[in-house]
Amino acid sequence: MMWGTKLLPVLLLQHVLLHLLLLPVTIPYAEGQKKRRNTLHEFKKSAKTTLTKEDPLVKIKTKKVNSADECANRCIRNKGFPFTCKAFVFDKSRKRCYWYPFNSMSSGVKKGFGHEFDLYENKDYIRNCIIGKGGSYKGTVSITKSGIKCQPWNSMIPHEHSFLPSSYRGKDLQENYCRNPRGEEGGPWCFTSNPEVRYEVCDIPQCSEVECMTCNGESYRGPMDHTESGKTCQRWDQQTPHRHKFLPERYPDKGFDDNYCRNPDGKPRPWCYTLDPDTPWEYCAIKMCAHSAVNETDVPMETTECIKGQGEGYRGTTNTIWNGIPCQRWDSQYPHKHDITPENFKCKDLRENYCRNPDGAESPWCFTTDPNIRVGYCSQIPKCDVSSGQDCYRGNGKNYMGNLSKTRSGLTCSMWDKNMEDLHRHIFWEPDASKLTKNYCRNPDDDAHGPWCYTGNPLVPWDYCPISRCEGDTTPTIVNLDHPVISCAKTKQLRVVNGIPTQTTVGWMVSLKYRNKHICGGSLIKESWVLTARQCFPARNKDLKDYEAWLGIHDVHERGEEKRKQILNISQLVYGPEGSDLVLLKLARPAILDNFVSTIDLPSYGCTIPEKTTCSIYGWGYTGLINADGLLRVAHLYIMGNEKCSQHHQGKVTLNESELCAGAEKIGSGPCEGDYGGPLICEQHKMRMVLGVIVPGRGCAIPNRPGIFVRVAYYAKWIHKVILTYKL
């Protein structure tokens, strides 16, 4: 698969600032060894950004490197550069770095866009405030506190001095800018142009004075990147030295830019993880704004008689929990001590002992006056009527009680009371009929993938509803593969079909062809069902008449396989849950199971496979040869845990429940285009199962880069549910 790249201009088209888009980057650090400088934390990142500076005299430096970390290290050291490095651009596709003596604030610089480029600017050159004594300040203020113009550092007029740029390398004694080369008290200063005043400090504010927040800082999006004790913050897109769940791509609305202080979890004020291995996190010193101007989109709608969403805007006077126990006053520490006080949560209306939701919990709550019951929810407060556009669900949505009544494909839901017989057919308990109101989307069978409903369309008996998880409610990360909880194999016996033991051949392997050309692989999991990847059928309303499933073949070019092959049309396509990258294909007629065509077993729902288990992938995809022979090939991989997988991906990957990681035993082996949809087959207790599905990843069989597969065990219940209910 080829990836497009944009070439940098040979001479003087440079790059910078369009918008912030964090991508994970790994910073090397070894505990127990001398701590290495986390230089990437000293740069502000602007993704897909370029700059243009049309000046033939400007020099730049370029070199092939392995990562943005290397670029940052070279820029900070400034070794071998004929200029002071203020910024760099990293070309992700070509692994090349471009170092610049200018940044986005320099004169004559124009902004641009470059898909493959990320710009990093040294924060010291773009800050308009100082941290601590201001020893790192490299801004352009050149006037003293009393308004006197500064004397250039390389000049001896009107004042002779020893602070020459050549004597203080690295202190950026450029032009006549205010500096603090010795890190003295008082902050940046300069010699003045007034013969009567030798030197004077400059009026540059502390960053803690410039930055301000409203309420408890949940909407703060400023560039404060140090804690109140002066520790540098860890980047949100990194897991070193502290592992955490607040990944920018998982919480796109939390403002996780670079390593800036944020408050994503309802703490009293903004905070950050630190670069100190012994200090996981600390609060940041950000003052309250004098005028509490709050972005209206960040303020929950206030209600007094009912709650909207999670009830963060509830301002009513209910003061007991659901069972009638009175609430404890928020300004009291008896009988329960706590830090959720009116002082710490100024904008949360913590008056008296009224039920509130100051920390983003499921609903309004309070500490109770019962010493044996610390907190309780005020679930007796009714929910306000909400439109479907505001709907969301928590967990798997089994408690969702909204009024949406359409599927994700736009079909109108049918009444639950007309479908109770079908519902009883695939669940083994009596559903709560009180929740199955009218034709609203619900989750009576505890489906792991959210609310759904029956439809009046016989070809689509049921489907999921277009409801998202509530903000902050995300798919948890995968369990540790070193400690499997559920065995994936359902039996220790080999499967037998029609009295014939399943062959050691790969009879379950399917070649999906479009107009007689192989496009994807697939797995025959039932006589009438094939499991494959969604990417093989990108258009939801695609005409299936041009698609065929070829079974029982080894040579995708059909040579010498007339007797064993079965060619079946596809009658139906069922898309998997949102984000699953899976589809199930219903065959026009069942496959005939014989010595050349067989089914592959599915794993138990939610099971895990031990790390280092050897598995295999199969496919007819790209092999690196111009004239591929079209033969089915196999590559052996081993299951890899989350931590090790993340290391191989330079910290850019954190597996969740729906993903599985496997690395090649042979360098350069792995799935490529044409293999997508094919299976990752593992064996447990002498039973082979399809544990993963190949989907497009981060390149094709890249050395030391394990593949990320769809974890079939996470979707096993959905697969069984579809097979059971899609009868036509």
Curated annotation (Swiss-Prot):
Free-text description of this protein's post-translational modifications in UniProt: The single-chain precursor undergoes proteolytic processing by TMPRSS13 resulting in an active two-chain form. The single-chain precursor undergoes proteolytic processing by HGFAC resulting in an active two-chain form.
Gene Ontology BP term (one): skeletal muscle cell proliferation
Domain of life of the source: Eukaryota
Pfam families: Kringle, PAN_1, Trypsin
GO cellular component, one term: extracellular space
Positions of glycan attachment: 295, 403, 569, 656
Family: Belongs to the peptidase S1 family. Plasminogen subfamily.
Protein name, per record: Hepatocyte growth factor
